[in-house]
Amino acid sequence: MEGKEEDVRVGANKFPERQPIGTSAQTDKDYKEPPPAPFFEPGELSSWSFYRAGIAEFIATFLFLYITVLTVMGVKRAPNMCASVGIQGIAWAFGGMIFALVYCTAGISGGHINPAVTFGLFLARKLSLTRAVFYIVMQCLGAICGAGVVKGFQPNPYQTLGGGANTVAHGYTKGSGLGAEIIGTFVLVYTVFSATDAKRSARDSHVPILAPLPIGFAVFLVHLATIPITGTGINPARSLGAAIIYNKDHAWDDHWIFWVGPFIGAALAALYHQLVIRAIPFKSRS
């Protein structure tokens, strides 16, 4: 059904303006759907920008693990929760670092910092398989190095305080942990798609420079909800880096959850955004 023009208030403008609503607001006049990324693009391998983007993902994930693992260890080291930043502080550390790092790297690599985000964007044909695999490898290497530097600086506390490794908490089943990871990653990747949607930035409803803010805030909220269940993975590189450096049996017992869950959540978010949210037809005018 075609939308009609109605009086609406746009932004902070106190004067009513005549604006089309519904599908009439979404013509090719203000937006053109970009072509999907090629499935495989070997030409990228000869481009410096390709490797620069991978280095940016490595450094960002390195810094992410370094700061967040130290924060988790600081909370566990405290004699009681009141003597530390607590769960809220951990959530702020994760969300704040994602906000800062996405802001710093978005213009270079897209600011993924998470294999699940990369996987979701790949399914939506936002990047090629070549770039997706390279990003995931660099993210995992960065996470391993970040956790490794923390252990290098504080070897004994790192081992005794758990090294920031993700495990399913006592009292929760594997299914509960898997569900928490699926839903948590869905929230994150859905937010990434919404915050970076070119269709929105083509109109006045979106300010692209603010995209890191909702992404970081989504990470913060998911951590508040799921830290008591799994310690919050929603990022396979983060879980892998901490598990490899910590290297205790219980850190590997349920490690599959922190890959399967985020990848399922990312796939569901990509499908939902592409098939439901973006499934509004664009009317072409001759």
From Swiss-Prot:
Record comment regarding domains? The Asn-Pro-Ala (NPA) motifs may contribute to the formation of two hemipores that could generate a narrow channel.
DNA-binding: is it a keyword of this entry? no
Alphabetical keyword list: Acetylation, Cell membrane, Membrane, Phosphoprotein, Repeat, Transmembrane, Transmembrane helix, Transport
Q: Which InterPro entries match?
A: Aquaporin-like, Aquaporin_transptr, MIP, MIP_CS
Q: What does this protein do?
A: Water channel required to facilitate the transport of water across cell membrane. Its function is impaired by Hg(2+).
| Protein name per Swiss-Prot or TrEMBL | Aquaporin PIP1-3
**Tissue distribution:** Expressed in roots, above ground, ripening fruit, flower buds, green siliques and senescing leaves.
Q: Point out residues bearing the modification Phosphoserine.
A: S284
Extract the ranges annotated as region (Disordered): 1-33
Q: Motif span (NPA 1)?
A: 114-116
Task: Report TM segments.
Answer: 55-75, 82-102, 133-153, 175-195, 209-229, 257-277
List localization entries: Cell membrane
Q: Which GO terms describe its cellular component?
A: extracellular region; plasma membrane
The answer to whether the entry has keyword Repeat is yes
PROSITE patterns, sorted = MIP
**Membrane topology, as annotated:** Multi-pass membrane protein
Identify the residue ranges that face the Extracellular compartment according to the record.
Answer: 76-81, 154-174, 230-256
Motif NPA 2 — list its residue ranges. 235-237
Residues annotated with N-acetylmethionine modification: M1
Checking SUPFAM superfamilies in the record gives: Aquaporin-like (SSF81338)
Q: What is its main location?
A: membrane
A Gene Ontology MF term for this entry? Answer: water channel activity
For this chain's UniProt record, which GO biological process terms are given? Answer: response to water deprivation; water transport
Q: Which family does it belong to?
A: Belongs to the MIP/aquaporin (TC 1.A.8) family. PIP (TC 1.A.8.11) subfamily.
